[in-house]
Amino acid sequence: MSQVYFDVEADGQPIGRVVFKLYNDIVPKTAENFRALCTGEKGFGYAGSPFHRVIPDFMLQGGDFTAGNGTGGKSIYGGKFPDENFKKHHDRPGLLSMANAGPNTNGSQFFITTVPCPWLDGKHVVFGEVVDGYDIVKKVESLGSPSGATKARIVVAKSGEL
């Protein structure tokens, strides 16, 4: 299974690294999209993009590297791609799942759960999990608000594959 990372900053100050394990065996197309966006090997990706929506006791959302506000992003496959499967459930904190605008609208936006979110099962594709740096996820979570607005500009300063 691939491992990738984000080096996260808040208002330009480094706060730490989050490492993810991707479920290549269960959702290979979804995992490959995220891996390639972490490396930037296609000429675009997550480096420099914000966590634009952070809701405490729910999730951290990012991955819009085109508009930076939740309206953009794109996949390595060109635009959106279909939901691969819903074999994994949102049953614990630290899961990596695709954000979308309805069925079969996966691009580059993702979220990291901070609680179990069973109401998202069958609607969002879980494709990985945090294996190191969950304390950094919690730091980012503390900078969010019920509306999703963040108290600092939280950015993926650097990302890549381990």
Swiss-Prot record:
Q: Name one GO molecular function term.
A: peptidyl-prolyl cis-trans isomerase activity
Q: What else is known?
A: Present with 86000 molecules/cell in log phase SD medium.
What the entry lists under InterPro entries is as follows: Cyclophilin-like_dom_sf, Cyclophilin-type_PPIase, Cyclophilin-type_PPIase_CS, Cyclophilin-type_PPIase_dom
Q: Which UniProt keywords apply?
A: Acetylation, Cytoplasm, Isomerase, Isopeptide bond, Mitochondrion, Nucleus, Phosphoprotein, Protein transport, Rotamase, Transport, Ubl conjugation
- Where is each PPIase cyclophilin-type domain found? 5-161
Q: Please state the Enzyme Commission number of this protein.
A: 5.2.1.8
Name the family. Answer: Belongs to the cyclophilin-type PPIase family. PPIase A subfamily.
Q: Which reaction does it catalyse?
A: [protein]-peptidylproline (omega=180) = [protein]-peptidylproline (omega=0)
Its function, per the record, reads:
PPIases accelerate the folding of proteins. It catalyzes the cis-trans isomerization of proline imidic peptide bonds in oligopeptides. Involved in histone deacetylase complexes, suggesting a function in chromatin. Imports fructose-1,6-bisphosphatase (FBPase) into the intermediate vacuole import and degradation (Vid) vesicles. Regulates the meiotic gene program via the Set3C histone deacetylase complex to promote efficient sporulation, and the prolyl-isomerase activity is required for this function.
Where is the Glycyl lysine isopeptide (Lys-Gly) (interchain with G-Cter in ubiquitin) crosslink found in the sequence?
K29, K42, K123, K139, K151, K158
Indicate where this protein resides in the cell: Cytoplasm; Nucleus; Mitochondrion intermembrane space
Residues bearing Phosphoserine are S142, S145
Residues that bear N-acetylserine: S2
Tell me which residues bear Phosphothreonine: T71
Q: Name one GO biological process term.
A: protein folding
In terms of Pfam families, this protein maps to:
Pro_isomerase
What superkingdom does the record give?
Eukaryota
Q: Give the protein name, as stated in the record.
A: Peptidyl-prolyl cis-trans isomerase
Quaternary structure note: Interacts with a complex composed of SIN3 and RPD3. Identified in the Set3C complex with HOS2, HST1, SNT1, SIF2, HOS4/YIL112W and SET3.
Enzyme class, broadest EC rank: isomerase
Activity regulation note: Binds cyclosporin A (CsA). CsA mediates some of its effects via an inhibitory action on PPIase.
Q: Listed GO cellular component terms?
A: cytoplasm; mitochondrial intermembrane space; mitochondrion; nucleus; Set3 complex
